[in-house]
Amino acid sequence: MARQATKLIANLSKKLSSSNPHTRCSEQTVWIGAAPPAVFVDKNTRVICQGITGKNGTFHTEQAIEYGTKMVGGVTPKKGGTEHLGLPVFNTVEEAKAETKANASVIYVPPPFAAAAIMEGLEAELDLIVCITEGIPQHDMVRVKAALKKQSRTRLIGPNCPGIIKPGECKIGIMPGYIHKPGRIGIVSRSGTLTYEAVFQTTAVGLGQSTCVGIGGDPFNGTNFVDCLEKFIADPQTEGIVLIGEIGGTAEEDAAALIKESGTQKPVVAFIAGLTAPPGRRMGHAGAIVSGGKGTAQDKIKALKEAGVTVCESPAKIGVSMLEVFKQRGLV
């Protein structure tokens, strides 16, 4: 089965690369009766679940429906034509999109087949794909990343992430919905559990969240800090930003550069995990490793502070730090 999945990825990658990029890039989503979401999702987002009949797909689809997310169908090969949780099940993403008018997908598919599921969503030209799966082979994700760069229609969030939520409107992923409260803070994080910590704290101090995005901890992901920060900076509902990073890579340094260049007046509070991590040892996530003298917490903290970001020494201080900055600037 794993060989079949790898073969499918290769075939789809070739097909994507052979298509006319100018034609693909010029296509625009038509949002009937509503503007496109400020930060990837809103109450109008129509979601299908790839892997809906599996244990994880079933549980989290139930949770999403209870939260109020517009779940419109699911995809499980060879189970097309059936129903699950009261939703129609299709054999392919293309069929599901045609029948349900879905514009987003969430993936709960085992690691050997997850990359093929992402590529299927790309082929169907969905606006958003959220991949929760952890442990996807890096070789598979390199091919997915290459395919993503050849088009501009579809955005991938993840893999190995908790997902994305706009409190009170749309929950796509595994995060606990009840800790979120509609509000003023945009949160972007490489860590799932630290995202929940930041959410709980910003809710506790009365600020709430505009949108929360878990970008995942793998080396090859679809959406990075810069992508999210650009959206948060432009979003009128987002008045402050929380950024949670970790050792490894240069994503946090890139984020610091954008914050500096943008000249945004929105307060940014950050926490970087892994300050005491030894070089060369992976800390939890596949991308959380200091190698070649790069990716240290100290470098990231320095870059963020130089960009005017308030950097917390402890994740327990994220909420109170943001509230203090809001008070200093007369925002509360």
Swiss-Prot record:
SMART domains named in the record: CoA_binding (SM00881)
Residues the entry annotates as binding CoA: 53-56, 79, 132-134
Active site, per annotation: 285 (tele-phosphohistidine intermediate)
Pathway assignment: Carbohydrate metabolism; tricarboxylic acid cycle; succinate from succinyl-CoA (ligase route): step 1/1
Amino acids binding substrate: 196
Gene3D superfamilies in alphabetical order: NAD(P)-binding Rossmann-like Domain, Succinyl-CoA synthetase domains
Tissue specificity note: Expressed in roots, stems, flowers, leaves and fruits.
GO molecular function term, any single one: succinate-CoA ligase (GDP-forming) activity
GO terms under biological process: succinate metabolic process; succinyl-CoA metabolic process; tricarboxylic acid cycle
Interval spanned by the transit peptide: 1-23
EC identifiers of the protein: 6.2.1.5
Subcellular localization: Mitochondrion
Domain of life (superkingdom): Eukaryota
PROSITE patterns listed in its UniProt record: SUCCINYL_COA_LIG_1, SUCCINYL_COA_LIG_2
This protein's record includes keyword Ligase: yes
Catalytic activity reported: succinate + ATP + CoA = succinyl-CoA + ADP + phosphate
GO cellular component labels: mitochondrion; succinate-CoA ligase complex (ADP-forming)
Keyword annotations of the record: Ligase, Mitochondrion, Nucleotide-binding, Transit peptide, Tricarboxylic acid cycle
Oligomer status and interactors: Heterodimer of an alpha and a beta subunit.
Assigned protein family: Belongs to the succinate/malate CoA ligase alpha subunit family.
Biological role: Succinyl-CoA synthetase functions in the citric acid cycle (TCA), coupling the hydrolysis of succinyl-CoA to the synthesis of ATP and thus represents the only step of substrate-level phosphorylation in the TCA. The alpha subunit of the enzyme binds the substrates coenzyme A and phosphate, while succinate binding and nucleotide specificity is provided by the beta subunit.
Name by which UniProt lists this protein: Succinate--CoA ligase [ADP-forming] subunit alpha-1, mitochondrial
